[in-house]
């Protein structure tokens, strides 16, 4: 009997059509997925049920009816008896859109619904032993107030106890969050905060009182420790725009600053200088001495305490020795426009020093006139060139240009009638003393930005050499024009600024230059052509710094193949080099304790005078000449 019943049931199951719910596709829009399962006739033996995800955010929680049987204890034996009750509960019509549901509850319910679908898909294929043939009945119920509003329902009778309990928990959680009314409470709290917040107003900065805002010292408050105000400081004198005004034009009286003008000693001094108006008749163009005899004479030159003189108050910028054979007279030009004269034969030695003030700025160049040794010509930065005449006791003005600053000059003619003057701005002036007035005959500009020294060739006096920033140029005075004069030759071997450039005193066959690159250079100027070759470069420290006068290497007028230059070496010394670069002699001693930047040698006698930056002169001479 049982076999026949089983066979009949098996045949009946083959003929009866089976139902299968459409599978959920992930690319469908969840918000518009219908809860009504589509009916599909499948000729298979088993039926599979898939749950489509749904959202409770569009429905009101008070109208959502969950099955009460989920709260009871479920088991596999109770599925059949409670099937009808679950159907009726889940087939109710759910009203549309639930309002005022928090976003947090929505996301929780959506995630839970999606999880149910995923877990059911995983569990149902594996439980083949417990699979049941479920008949899915789809019913439509209509609301009395609407004609077409229908809501699909699902049959949850085939769910496991775990799934039904899980749906119950989801529903209870949704009810709980809805009962809290979090969104409404948040809205009310937000309104309360906005109402309580006072209006924002810009804070006004308090005005500072006129009193002292910060702590200050008694020195700044100008009070003493007892609190008494200190007396007001005296008003400093107003500085004049030009601290060194130019001296008035015209001749200046020769007035000594350190000696009385009316005493007999000063008159005797002027008479002594005026008596030297005749130039020396001794031939200075005799042949050169041998180096051996020259060294012997240099070794006999000594310095003593009696031959150190304090002449001026400022640094010495220029120096000249009078060519007298009987008296030793030294002239110096100082920084503050002073011209000092020193007679070494006068005793005591303080009585032989006379200081005059013919200029207002540094005296950079000083020469005794070759035609009249009683005349001394001085040139200054203040743009004046004066001639001191001791026979008349005046400083006569030779050339004046208040718009320019002079740097150096030399005599173009042997009778000292014409002069060439170099300017700091690179211009050159040709001055004729025979022309009335204090102006120039010709003014020309050079290709140099600055001129420091000017020196005339001793034989071919139409040529003169200038030293400037980087180059040394040789010009022809006959070719100077009013616009810009081009040099005949340029010595371009120098790498830094040049302090001086001088022809050799007798023949002019050599040129010595002093450069800031710590080199002395000697050139062969025996043939003034397109190029003058470099003969010798002597390494010598010429870095004097800011407070010392720059070195200027000069030829010995008696021995034109030897150069005299100051030295920065210790102990202090004055050195003489041969044109080949060999050191010939070094002057020194216990009374030479400073750097002698400016040096001059007597044209015929073995007398050397060196000036330092404190206004002192140091004289080396033979004991016979003392």
Swiss-Prot record:
GO MF: DNA binding; enzyme binding
Cellular component GO terms, alphabetical: heterochromatin; nucleus; site of DNA damage
Ranges of the WD repeats in the UniProt entry: 311-352, 358-400, 402-441, 446-485, 493-533, 535-565, 590-626
Keywords: Repeat, WD repeat
Tagged with keyword Acetylation: no
SUPFAM superfamilies: WD40 repeat-like
Entries under Pfam families matching the protein: WD40 (PF00400)
Biased composition (Polar residues): 99-123
Biological-process GO terms, alphabetical: DNA damage response; regulation of DNA damage checkpoint
Keyword Repeat part of the UniProt annotation: yes
Quaternary state and interactors: Interacts with CUL4A and/or CUL4B.
Name listed for the protein in its UniProt record: WD repeat-containing protein 76
Record gene name: WDR76
